[in-house]
Structures are given as structure tokens and as C-alpha cells.
Amino acid sequence: MEPAFPASSAGVQSQSGPEPGAGQQEPPPPATPLRPVASQSRFQVDLVTEGGGGGDGQKGQTAAQPAAAAKDKDRGDGGAAAPSPASPAAAAEPPAAAAEEAKGRFRVNFVDPASDEPPLSSQQQPPPPSSASSAHGGHQPPSESMNGYPQNGDTMMSEGSLHSSGTGAHHYYDTHTNTYYLRTFGHNTIDAVPRIDHYRHTVAQLGEKLIRPSLAELHDELDKEPFEDGYVNGEESSPAEEAVSKHVADNKGVVKFGWIKGVLVRCMLNIWGVMLFIRLSWIVGHAGIGLALLVIGTATVVTTITGLSTSAITTNGFVRGGGAYYLISRSLGPEFGGAIGLIFAFANAVAVAMYVVGFAETVRDLLVEHNALMIDEMSDIRIIGSVTIVVLFGISVAGMEWEAKAQIVLLGILLLAIVNFTVGTFIPANDKRAKGFFNYRGEIFSENFVPDFRDGEDFFSVFAIFFPAATGILAGANISGDLADPQLAIPKGTLLAILITTIVYAGAAVSVGSCIVREATGNLTDAIIPGTVTNCTNVACKLGFNFSSCATNKCSYGLMNDFQVMSLVSGFGPLITAGIFSATLSSALASLVSAPKIFQALCKDNIYPGLHVFSVGYGKNNEPLRGYVLTFFIGLGFILIAELNVIAPIISNFFLASYALINFSVFHASLAKSPGWRPAFRFYNMWISLIGAILCCGVMFVINWWAALLTNVIVLALYIYVTYKKPDVNWGSSTQALTYLNALQHAIRLTGVEDHVKNFRPQCLLMTGAPTSRPALLHLVHAFTKNVGLVVCGHVHTGPRRQALKEISTDQAKYQRWLIKNKMKAFYAPVYAEDLREGTQFLLQAVGLGRMRPNTLVFGFKKDWRQALMKDVENYINAIHDAFDYQYGVVVIRLKEGFNISHLQAQEELCTSQEKSAHPKDIVVNLEHSDADSSKPSSKSVSETNSPAVCQDQKDEEDDGKASTQPLLKKEVKDPSVPLNMTDQKLLQASSQFQKKQGKGTIDVWWLFDDGGLTLLIPYLLTTKKKWKDCKIRVFIGGKINRIDHDRRTMATLLSKFRIDFSDITVLGDMNTKPSKDNITAFEEMIEPFRLHEDDKEQEASEKMKEEEPWRITDNELEIYRMKTYRQIRLNELLRENSGTANLIVMSLPVARKGAVSSALYMAWIETLSKDLPPILLVRGNHQSVLTFYS
């Protein structure tokens, strides 16, 4: 029998040779079976070979299955066991029928990588019920007959493998002769059922990435060669898969937080800052209870909208570390993300200093109160702040787990302080009445409900003071990488934190406004003796105290004057001080942790290349120790300044800029209508998010207008920098989605616009083949289409279909990336066809979208047409005819040295491979190439000889489409002992000549025939470009000798109406003069090999030859077009005489009548017309006007 496919994945050696007999003992399985890596759950396909002519009824077997096992496994009755040779059923089944049944079948074996146990052999595997029953000849109970198998056919899937029974064994399924496994969907095909592991990134945090079968594996013909290593397409443990395994292993033991400890606690601690204890009472005093609640409510509206937007973004896919930077960058792209990420990380680093200085100031006030200053007030702040940040730095470096424990302790202290304040409002305040505290009083509430702004304060200034307290809502999101489930934790924790803290702020505002009067002296002597008549009318007088002296003298107590009102009201004053310490330290600790995490994520993305050193993480939690050190020194520096009144508003604006962009991200993503924008969190609205973004921007200017302007300038500067650097990332941002949507909408809108001559643009289908192989052709066409018209680089792939289609799939991204990297505003369009003509026809008909379709076909001249196969020449000329048929304009460009440098690229690649080889051999490359044939790569003949290598010593580069011609175009020959030959040197220089500034020269336009104006429009467009602007246009036209002046004036008038500048007009009156004999002779010698010479042959022979070789030139044809031939020869003489020194020649392309002029004669005309000249464009429009003098 034929050798079958090896199946190393099963751990069974492949077998070939004669089939063993029925009684032959089965070889034992190897002790250590081969298995795929942990990151694979793959499959293999075994061909079932045709059975031999034996009489035992066996239908053949796979190599992975021993013969004895095959007899038990291969059964044709759908479920019964295969009969043994001795059974009647075996004799009853005809061998021919068995062999016929086996034809065309293949067996799908699935490999479970999750199990460490060796596979069961065929004898060890428990059979299905029908098999067991039949084999043992009797009925067994269901529990026994199903021994080793799941009870239901749909329970075969396990977490480790799609096709594992969960018992640790690998099962091999014959899905065509065994219908048992058809009960479980997905077990009878290599097609994969839907599974989450197929959608993971290469290195996923929640599991391993599995690779589904490719479309080619399902659709292509089955290869006759065995799969390498037993895996489909020879799949092995790739570097990416090894990285997955390593990443999963490294993640063991990582500390992850839930929504309470990770988000809720952090957000509440950051929002409950010192504002709650030392500024809220002052706000109520000025704004009154009513406006104070409005201030809190307005801030809550902004933070709630931002929280909703944050929730929408975080539930639209898996969230990694980086907080606000990650959310914005993955939504709006690297430009906004890079700008915000840097300032947001810096803002958090400086916020550490702000909170620590707030703590130090509180400690300093205690020292002043007890007369215990160390040096002076400012120096004490620096000393206390420095010691504090060192302690906080030690906690953060110790790890997130220790930091989280410290936050829990601080939250406990803070909650005790809030409870202490609440209880204190109910304790009778007999000894505190002189300081303005009277417990809950309706009169005090009524008086304090209305505002009483003083000292130039107003609603907006009070709001500006309060709002920074609400900027802690992203404290949980900032450590998104350390959350167990960010998609659940961030929305739940953030929104709940906003709700709780808002209730506490509002409750505290109402409490202090209901208990304490605005001003109090603190003197018990101001108590009103009952029966005494006073002139005061405020609520304090009604409560027994006359504080009217505060109207003229500065008082120290009351809502307006005392920042320590919370301590006054509380049941135990020192606990409020501890609460202030807790609020400042917890906020400082949260910022100290957030800043390095955000900065690390920013550096990992390599948005700013110089900062990549800070992306390194340490330990199981990937702690950014370098970022901690940087944040420590930034915070320490601002602590030593000890004056944060100037920097504080800028920091608040940095936070608000981040919130504005988060809101805008949701609006932008919703506006783009990307199918990928589908957040699991549904309670958001794109217009509310837009309002939130506008509110954030408004609040920025309310807090401090100059700080808002400075923030916007910094963000804009960073945005421009990142845009200019163009980081090589692709995150599927909403910016890309909206760009697509706008392009789609505008393309559709454009289809309803009728063409107009004033809006004509040359839109070129440029037959470059691989764009890297003809750079000069691409640069020249790009010069007159850049920012004006469309360029599509057509590439016709020929040869074996399967190979060509694979090349197309890889070349599409490769060459489009090369065009972008080389700043070519062009598209790449590959197509598969039998030959160049067919491929060009496909492109002419199909390329483009709506009005964005090519209207001009551009070819490079086929320089080697006389040596090439005439079939290729016929295809080349017919492609030009096809373009005219499709109403395209045609441009044929000729460069004396040629365009095709693919043989130099091939030579470079061979040199590179030679340098990499352990035993380098001398290689000689013999190449024959064409400048026009873009249907296939140049033919190569590679031979190993002892001659010196003809290659340059150049640096090896990966063949990824990134400027692969740049080494050839920019590097000089470094090794003089192996130079390029003279022809290749000239070709190499010519390939880059259109990349240089052309300098002062001329563009000679030979506008011999009116084609609609394309021959004149192209040179005009060239002169508008920077590299060609110093060139002057000279126009040459045909005319009569006796009307030269008249023809010149007529043309000058026409050009002036077209608004086209020119330096000179030349009228050629001797165009129809007979060319020189030498040139005529040269032409005749050139076409001699292509002539039919029918007069020298019998009529039947000549007709047969003409039918077989239609490209040949007949004597009759040559005679009919003799004058046209002479014209081409004469024009070449005039061109060399008048335009031999021009920078560029643009000339009307002669048109050959289809079916009348042979391909060889037409090529000879073009060859004769354009030889021995500077770069020349032979142009023929489609005879529709492209110029107009009407407005």
C-alpha cells in the first residue's frame, strides 16, 4: 500500500511497507509521545489509503494507526465494530467495495495539548457502546458500555482542548466511518468552533492564544506531502507562542485587585481630600447652602459624565495598564494619547508634591500652635515634606499589595473622621457657642442658605476652589493593569465612589451650614444677657450672642473665617486632624503609584523613543521601579520649592484636559459608527459626552484662564510632535474609523457630481509591477500627480495560480507600506492574470471607486522588445489598444538607461544570503530584464562559480517592504574590488534622477496633435512642483513654412487663454522632409527580423505564417504606412536637433489603427521616435478636453 502521512502528534511512529498480517502483534507506543507546545490546540489530517486485495475486508489504514487497531477502528456500518477475519461479516463484505469506500477519505485527528498523559493506544481505548457490545457478544449496562466516555456526545469539549475528553487521554477520531463522534458538533471537521482563545492577542493576560485553521488549510487542495512534525503546515512552537507560554507562567502569583480595593477605595480617598475638612465650610460661608450644593452638583455632573464615558471605553474591550493614557490613546490614537499621557503622568507626579506639602503645612501649623518649630515655617515644610515622600516612596516600592493595605488603613481613619464630625453635630455645644456653633438650627439654615460673597469672590471663583477636589475619579482607572477585571471594576467602583463622595460632600455642606453662623468672635463676653436691648438683627442675636463687632473688626471664627470648623464641630478634634493627614497622604500615595504606571504604559508604546528606558518592569507585578524613582525626584523637587500656588491651577487643568478628551473619545467613537465600538456599558450618550467635554474645557477657563491657555498650547505642541514623528502603531482608533467614514461619505457624494473640464485631474494607472523595481517611473508620475490626482500602481502577477495568490496577499501590505514610508501618495493594486494584457484589462475595468477612478494608463517603454518573446510584445501593444478602447489616455515613458532595477535588488539579496551563509559561494547572476513587463519578475539564472562575486558590501535589511530600494538609491559602492558594471551604474544613477531638484532647464512640449490637452497639462503640472519649478516650458508645433509667424501667434493666444506660461514657441515647417538615408537604413535593419516577406513565399505558406504570427510586418503594410514611418524617423532627427539638452520631453504619441498596424511596426515607430533622447513622455489623451479657457 502507499505510505500514509506521519502522525507524530499522536506519539505513534509512521509505518510504511507491507501491511502486517491479522495476527501480527501490535508494537507498543513510545514511552514519551511527541506533543505540541502548550499554546497549541491543533489538528492533523491523515489520508486513508486504498485497501489491498486481501480478503479480510480491511479497507486500509493510516500510518498513525497500526494494522491490528485499524481492523477494529475502520468500520463501514456507522457504529458496529469492524468484523474480525473469522467472523461471517468479514467474508460477506467484498474487498472491492471496501476499497471503493476508502477512496477520497481522510481522517481528522485532534491533538489535546492540555494533557500530560500519553495517548491511549487502539487496544487501550474504551470502545463506544455499540462496538463494545458487538465485540463482547452480549449486552452490557450503560454505565459499563460507556466506560471512559462522556455520557452525552456534546460534552467532549474541555478548557484545554476543543477535542479532549477531559480524562487526560488524546482521542483520535475516524469521522467518516464512525458516526459516534458525529453526535458532537465540531468533531467531524478541522474547522474550529467559536472559542474565546482564538480572539486573544499574541500575549494575553487572561489565557493563551489559539490559532484557528486558516482559510487556505480548509479550502486548498490537500497536499500530498506529509505535514512537518505532524502539525498542519509544519506549525511548531513559534516565538509568539513561546512568549504566550512564558507570559502565562510569569503571571502566576501576580497581585490583582477587585473593584472595592482597587477602584472604590482609591477614588474615594482621592476625592475626599483636604477640601472636605478645611475648605468646604468656607465655600458654604460665601456661596450659601444653596449655591454650595450647586457647586457640588455642577462638579458632580462633570465627573459623572466623565465616569460614564470612562465606563463606556473600559467596557469596549480588554483594558491594560495605563489608565487615562491607555483609554485615550486606544480611542483617539497615539497623537492625543501621547500628548495627554505625558502631561497626565507629569500632573500626577507634581500632585504628589501638592498633597505632601498640604500634609506638611498641617503639621507645621500644629508645631506653631505648640511653639515647636524646628527652623522656620518654610524650612519645616521642606523637612517634613521630604521625610514624608521618602516614607511614601518606600511603601510604593514595596509593592502594590502593601500600598493597597496602607490605603485601607488611611480610608479607615478618614471614615472615622467623617463619623466623628457627624456625631459632633448632635453633641450639645454649650461651650462652643461663642465660636458660632449652635447645633442644628432652622434659623441658621435659613440665613446661610443664601450667598454672601465678600472680598471679590463670586460663584466661579468659589467653584474654581472646590473643583480640584473632584479630580480623583481616575485614581482606580490609573492602575487598570493591576485590576483583576477592569471592565467590571472601573465602571462599578468609579460611579459608586462619585455617588458616595457627592452625598458626603452635600451632607457636610448642609450640616455646617445648619450649625454654624458665618462670623463669630469667640469671646464669651459677647453673650447677650437676657432682658438686654440690642440693635443686632442676625440669627446669632436670637441665639444669645452679639457678633456685630465682626462687621468692623476681623473675627477669627465662623464659616467665613475659621478653616478648622470641622474640628470645632467634631466630637474629638484630633481625629479630624488625623483625617486631614489621612486624606493628604492617601491622595499623595495614589498619585505616587499612578504616575509611574501611566508613564510606563506610555514608554512601552514607544511614542517618545528616548523614554523607552522607563518601560522596564520588575517583579511579578511588573513594577515600574525606574518610574517610581523619577516620580520621587519630581515630587521632591517641587516639595523643596514649597510654593505651589502657581503650579496648582496648571495641574488641575492637566487633569481636566484628560477628562475632556475621555469624553470626546466617546463622542468621536460614536460619531465614527465603527462596528468595533460596542461597549457593554449601555448608560452613555454621545451628545452627553460631548457636553461633558465642553464643560471640562469651560471649567478649565473658569479655574484659571491663563493656565487653560498654557495647557492647550502644551497639548497642541505634543500633538504636533507625535504627529510629525508618526509612531509605528495601529490601535484601531476612532480617528481611523472616522477617516474611513468621511472618505466613504465623500466618495458617495462625489458619485453624484457630473464630470467637468475645469475639475479634470490626471488619475493614473501606473503599470510599475512591484513599485520598488521601477522607482524612477513612480517618482516621475508622482511628480505631476502629487496632491492633484490619483496614482494606482498596477502589478500583474502571472505563473502558478496558487503561488501568485499567496504573493498577492503578502505584497498588498508590503508594497503599500513601502509607498507610505517613501512618502508616495499612491495605491498598490495587484492582480492575478494569465498574461500582462489580461491583467491590464482587469485593472482598467475594476480599479477605482466611483469618481476616484484612473483615466490615464502609464507604461514604461519595453526596452528589450527586440529580444523578448513576441507574444509579450503583442500583449504590450494590445494593452495600449485596450486602454484606448476603454477611453483612457495613454502615456509611454522612456528613459535611455531604462527603469527596471529589480536585477540589482536580486543581486543585493543574493549577496546578503551569501554573507549569512556558513560556507559562502561565489554567485554570478545573469539577468534579462524589461522595463515594461510588469507581469512577472525578471528571469534569473543563478550559477555557482569560482569567479568573484559581483555584489556590494551592503547592510542586510529585512524584506518587509520598508524602502527596499533605499540601499541601492542612497549608498555608494564601498568595495572598489567588486564594482557594478558601467551599465548598472548608469541605471542606478538614472533611477534616482527624478528625486533631485531639476535646476534651470527646459521641458520641451511637442504638441503635434490635439488630444484634448493632456500633452500640455502634464508639463504644466510638473512646473508647479518644487523640484521642477525652475524649468521653463518650450512648445513645438507643426506648421507650414509660409505661415510660421501666424501659427506661432495662434498658439501663443491659445496658451495665454489656458493661463499656461511658456518661454518659447517653435513652429516646425520641415516635418515632412524625407529623413536621411542612414536613418532609413537603420530602421529597415531594425524591422528586418520581424517582416513577413510574403512576396518571397507561396501564398498558402505566407497566410499560414501571418495567422500564426500576426505581429509580423507585411510588405503591403509597410508600403501603406511608409510616409508615417518616415515621419517618425524625421521627428527623431528634429528631437535630437532641438531638444537634445532638455530636462524632459513631452510629445504626442502616434496612434496605430487596430487591426491594420502590426505590433512589431508600432513598436518600431515608438522605438525610432524616442531613441537616443533625454527622458521622454509619449502622451495621447482620450480626445476629451482637459483644458478650458472659460471661467
UniProtKB/Swiss-Prot annotation:
Topological domains on the Cytoplasmic side lie at 1-258, 309-339, 402-404, 477-491, 597-624, 665-687, 719-1191
Where is it localised? Basolateral cell membrane
Record-listed K(+) binding positions: N270, I271, Y355, P468, A469, T471
Output a single Gene Ontology CC term carried by this record. basolateral plasma membrane
Q: Where is the composition biased (Low complexity)?
A: 13-25, 59-69, 80-99, 131-141, 935-948
Residues in the Extracellular compartment per record: 368-377, 427-458, 514-571
Reactions mediated catalytically:
K(+)(out) + 2 chloride(out) + Na(+)(out) = K(+)(in) + 2 chloride(in) + Na(+)(in)
Task: List the transmembrane segments.
Answer: 259-288, 289-308, 340-367, 378-401, 405-426, 459-476, 492-513, 572-596, 625-645, 646-664, 688-705, 706-718
Q: Name one Pfam family in it.
A: AA_permease
Q: In which tissues is it expressed?
A: Strongly expressed in rectal gland, brain, gill and intestine. Also detected at lower levels in heart, kidney, and testis.
Q: How is its activity regulated?
A: Activated following phosphorylation by OXSR1/OSR1 and STK39/SPAK. Inhibited by bumetanide.
GO MF terms listed in the record are: ammonium channel activity; metal ion binding; metal ion transmembrane transporter activity; sodium:potassium:chloride symporter activity
Single GO biological process annotation from the record:
cell volume homeostasis
Q: Which residues of this chain are annotated as glycosylation sites?
A: N523, N535, N546
**Where is the segment annotated Disordered?**
1-166, 929-972
**Cysteine disulfide partners in this protein:** C536-C541, C550-C555
Region feature (Scissor helix): 734-751
**Polar residues bias located where?**
142-155
Q: Which domain of life is it from?
A: Eukaryota
Q: Which family does it belong to?
A: Belongs to the SLC12A transporter family.
- Show the PANTHER family listed in the entry: SOLUTE CARRIER FAMILY 12 MEMBER 2, SOLUTE CARRIER FAMILY 12, CATION COTRANSPORTERS
Protein function: Cation-chloride cotransporter which mediates the electroneutral transport of chloride, potassium and/or sodium ions across the membrane. Plays a vital role in the regulation of ionic balance and cell volume.
The protein's name is: Solute carrier family 12 member 2
What species is this protein from? Squalus acanthias (Spiny dogfish)
Organism classification, top ranks? Eukaryota, Metazoa, Chordata, Craniata, Vertebrata
